[in-house]
Amino acid sequence: RQRQMCIRDRYIGELYMGHLRYSTTGKSGMSYVHPFLRRNNWRSRNLLLCGNFNMTNVDQIFNTVVSQGQHPRIYSDTFIILEQLGHALDMEHDRLYREYRDKAADGNGLARLIEDNINVDNILRDQARLWDGGFVICGMTGSGDMFALRDSKGIRPAFYYHDDEIVVVASERPVIQTVLNVGVDDVKELTPGSALIVGKNGGISVDDILGEGENRRCSFERIYFSRGSDKDIYKERKALGENVVPDLLEAVGHDLDNTVFSFIPNTAEVAFYGMMEGLEARLAKQKADAIKALDASAADYDRRLAEILNKRLRQEKVAIKDIKLRTFIAEGASRNDLAAHVYDVTYGVVRETDNLVVIDDSIVRGTTLKQSIIRMLDRLNPKKIVVVSSSPQVRYPDCYGIDMSRMGEFIAFKAAIELLKDRGMQSVIDETYAECLRQLELPMDEMENAVKRIYAPFTDREISRKMAEMLTPAGTRAEVEIVYQSIDGLHRAITSCPGDWYFSGDYPTPGGNRLVDKAFVNYYEGNADKR
């Protein structure tokens, strides 16, 4: 009867695990789909693994696994960690086998004793200390134990909820709220360095595995990846939009009468609301000052007062996006082709004397801007196009789970390199390469980010101007300017997640400095596909 139920009901188990992880290797295919499975005839030795992560020291972990006598078939962080934790599970299994082999009546009884007494802490504690990276790693044994472990600096997000009937862990809070219909205070953040462990008997604990380190929660999660429906993220994205108002006003000469404001769908919409609120506040002050300056006894007082009160910001839905397509997470080979077919525009809302301001959540590679957005916006014949980024300039690669690992992909980096060449400063590029090679000879915990030298000679605005020049397609009629969020503005908006290595180059772990130096060496040596 139990077998018939399992056949009839596909999802009949008590534990479910999966991850909608887009490949951070720049590739796709079934071999990259989580979870990964380590099989064994002993039920308690089976292990499933999935996670939101990348490790920066896969070679070190690989060498540790090999030193234990293993010979892994695949060299990837997920597979190596699966084998590492699988070996630790085997050791825990053997410990319990020795302890209970004389106390069990038969093999099945011994297997049950082992399953009932597996200590997940023993599996995680020593192994996880070898990991350098940002991670939330979830695992499940064949006997029914489950765990979710978060890195000690909180780089990758994790939230959980439990009651008498269910335990759930996810990377985002609002999805738990929506699916289970629970309040925001019912969903807890998994403490960095801790593991949520659910035993086969239903017991739940949050155990300190690595200790909580310095807070380096990832700010880019909040800007782009996470759902904007989260209570805190919604406020943060609005604040990001408001913080760019002074610089965008300067870009349009404070001419609100001849400026149309819009956004690049879809993740920038909330930042757009914040930007408009900031502009409304400034317009309200302008109105108040203008009213105070009026002569109430003048014959045209009523007309002039009405003109002031009727002033409105011109906001329109100018860009239209196919909601099914996201160019940021597309594979490198298809990104350019995809970018040209994602957007359309609304005609008839922009005059030839207008500035057109559009805000986007971030400008990383600039592919979509050059291949599609600027071309489309220029068809509306504005005098000037101002593209505003709610995030700062993305200057450095990520190595903790977001697919931004090649140095030469970043438009900010390309712009800095071009500026160095324009000004006869090739020596800075050569010296940076030499310093990166020197850094890579040091122990990992002594390495520094040598790539900061590339940006040091220039101001943010100089780099932004060069980016605008490089991203403006040939034949564009409008003047194009790019305005970026400042790093200070980022931190004022997102106070709880100070991890800003993409923008500042200040990596949260030693492995980050190693990989950024390695990324520059690959770029300099012409190995564009290496990560």
Model feature map: region roles:
Residues 203-217, 263-267, 271-297:
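Terminal amphipathic helices with adjacent charged low-complexity linkers/tails
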Residues 1-4, 8-191, 197-260, 264-265:
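Conserved short alpha-helical segments that host acidic/polar catalytic motifs at enzyme active sites
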Residues 261, 268-275, 279, 315, ...:
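Extended, hydrophobic alpha-helical segments in both membrane/secreted and soluble proteins
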Residues 139, 150-151, 171-173, 200, ...:
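Active-site proximal loops enriched in glycine and acidic residues that flank catalytic Cys/His/Asp
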Residues 130-133, 237-257, 270, 275-278, ...:
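Phosphate/ATP-binding catalytic cores across multiple sugar-kinase/actin-like superfamilies
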Residues 99-118, 279-289, 297-298, 304-318:
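Amphipathic alpha-helical
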Residues 127-128, 143-145, 150, 162, ...:
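PRPP-dependent phosphoribosyltransferase catalytic core
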Residues 254-267, 386, 480-485:
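Short glycine-rich phosphate-binding loop at a beta-alpha junction
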